[in-house]
Design a protein with these regions (language model features):
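Catalytic micro-motifs at enzyme active sites that drive phosphoryl/nucleotidyl and oxygen chemistry
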Residues: 25-26, 51, 202-203, 218-220
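Conserved C-terminal RecA-like helicase domain
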Residues: 1-4, 11-14, 113-212
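Conserved P-loop NTPase catalytic core
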Residues: 1, 5-6, 10-112, 119-121, ...
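Composition- and surface-driven signal marking solvent-exposed, interaction-prone regions
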Residues: 12, 49-54, 133-138, 225-230
Length: 230
């Protein structure tokens, strides 16, 4: 079962009902005297949370090492402690502004060093109204960056520069970095895209440049975002 956490589990369990796909798979699993049901996924959380009584909790787990272009689960979920790349929103005074400034900073380093794209993904909810709310917040914070270009924004972007530690490319000079950051906000070169069942977004729209992409489950199924950084 490829992407075994998507449709195979009982998605109606909280309503005391059984989803059709889960019911049919149960019939297949239980219809033979012996069988192996192999579940494959890169996001196994829902499978691990199944009870043994449900028949959907794995009896064994095999973990594949990540390929050369992937960081792997251990990078984001170490056995102890909090990874340095993770920040909890509850601990940030203005989380949306912080994310916008950080992404502009990272995008400036990438684009100034010859990179093509820097994408930032927002998955706040499955509700489309929430997607619009966050898109408006991001646009508001970008406008703040423009209004405070030579003041607070410049101070914040300089602080972020000192925190950058790129590993694939050399760190560009501060002047190059700042010039690119100003280009992004002055030239209205930052895209804010909503991706859900209500909007039609082409992959070419997030293949280049500095982008914020907001959506729900659409972001995690059948779509690949190049240069996905946060």
């Amino acid at each position: 079962d490829d992407e075994a956490d998507a449709a195979s589990l009982n998605t109606l369990v909280n309503k005391d009902r059984q989803s059709s796909i889960n019911k049919y798979l149960n019939t297949i699993k239980n219809g033979s005297s012996s069988s192996i049901y192999l579940q494959v996924t890169g996001t196994p959380q829902a499978i691990f949370l199944q009870t043994l009584e449900s028949g959907w909790h794995p009896y064994f787990t095999y973990y594949f090492q990540p390929g050369a272009s992937y960081l792997g689960g251990d990078f984001f979920f170490p056995s102890t402690g909090k990874p340095y790349c993770v920040n909890f929103l509850e601990e940030i005074e203005e989380p949306t502004k912080s994310v916008v400034i950080r992404h502009i900073a990272v995008a400036s380093q990438i684009l100034a060093s010859g990179g093509k794209v820097a994408n930032c993904l927002f998955h706040p909810s499955v509700r489309q109204a929430t997607h619009k709310k966050y898109a408006d917040e991001i646009i508001k914070e970008i406008a703040w960056c423009v209004e405070n270009r030579d003041g607070e924004f410049k101070d914040e972007i300089e602080r972020e520069y000192h925190n950058l530690a790129p590993t694939k490319k050399d760190k560009v000079s501060y002047d190059q970095y700042l010039q690119k950051a100003f280009e992004l906000i002055d030239g209205k070169a930052i895209q804010v895209l909503i991706m859900n069942g209500k909007t039609d977004i082409d992959s070419e729209q997030y293949e280049t440049g500095c982008n914020f992409v907001i959506g729900g489950n659409t972001l995690g199924r059948g779509v690949t975002f190049p240069g996905s950084l946060s």
